[in-house]
């Protein structure tokens, strides 16, 4: 498969994952407004899921059993993911206290940690990390880590939190892409620099046999705004200082 086609396919997969999260966010908001819609419709834990979406911790404790906590909704979304997507921190904490597993695979193979890493509000990731969540848990389908999810969503704060919690910058997905490759594919040099400073391997190659610099080199300088150019200069400076500049050449 030509490299350009591979890149478009990888980005399409990432976009679909973000679209799925956005769709469930909208569904959660609708349920909070009293509309009867839930990915748990028809499931035995519907009442529990409704309590989760409302932030009703008493209802959560009254409804929770181990079987109900483990039962998934449509698209395999977990209750803990539903709490995150419903933006209910009290529900997240209540579910964690009841033993909900933040590493369990759910929506599109992601864990709750992946989901929290993608949201704008970082408090949900903070709650999961405070509970000792497995920071390097893999997506059950793609093999991607929460660090990769944060990169794809462009979440700098979550990326920093995951790095501080010990996230491994060198772990790749099933296509061989590390978070550094993904940062280059979506053209975010400032996130790439953070990963490099945290120990990411600049020479790592994916299944296509290319390092992250190849993807950055596909963005012509004349298409960059001033902010992006400044970020590229900082990245170049770091690479030159670590004798890696020959691996990266912009057109």
Q: Where does each model-flagged region fall?
A:
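Ankyrin-repeat-protein effector appendages
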Residues: 2, 23, 27-47, 198, ...
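Start-of-repeat signature of ankyrin repeats
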Residues: 44, 76, 109, 142-143, ...
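Ankyrin repeat A-helix N-terminal signature
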Residues: 50-55, 82-88, 115-121, 149-155, ...
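Ankyrin repeat structural motif
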Residues: 56-64, 88-96, 121-129, 155-163, ...
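Ankyrin-repeat inter-repeat connecting loop/turn
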Residues: 69-70, 102, 135, 169, ...
